[in-house]
Amino acid sequence: MAVVGTLTVPTGTTNKVAQSSETRNAPAKATDRASSDEETTPSDEPSPTPSPEPSPRRYSGVSAKVIKLRKSDWTDVWLVTLTHRGQSNFIVSPLDARGAEQSSIVNEIGIYKGSVLLNEDEGTETAALKIDADGKWTVTLKPISKARQWTGAGLTGRGDDVVIVNPPSAGLTTVNARHSGSSNFIVDAYTESSRENLVNEIGSWRGEVPLPDGTILVTVHADGVWSFKKS
């Protein structure tokens, strides 16, 4: 597992150190045999059981609404998938435990479908989501592990998205990015210790940018079709 602040995503690796066959099969020393009956070696200790992932939380409604989250969900980092079928504003803003409104996670007009992060910044707490809409909407909170996986060289998508880079980037890696749209095109990369903005443009755009070493997650904010290709 890898952590960005409070953000935890799977990277396809574990923290266990595998022993070589020579080490596993080597005969024990006499002193080791004498103590083995009385002591439990670290390798014999059971591995801690990982905490189960929370199940998805799905909410739906029409027009304005305040969704109060379970208290146990307030500080978790979530992948939030949203839809809206309306003609006017669709704005989703987190509220803290005192009801204070935070920066919106979605601010669009008309029909919308996309995925964004919630509580990715360390210390963030969300007690509720304030929905401003004129049509039907859905909001689904899911564990980060349910995000799309970027496993090959190329990746395509449309609109807002969150993508796990698997395996994480290593060494000098560049990304050729393209966007066909009329509004924002913002791309951020997350490593175990930092977040870096890769692209911040408006409208159609194409270019090549470096992907930070150790990138485990990429977020995209876009209104059109986009594509990435690593090299």
Where are the predicted features?
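Hydrophobic membrane-insertion alpha-helices, especially the h-region
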Residues: 1-7
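Acidic, Ser/Thr/Pro
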Residues: 16-17, 42-231
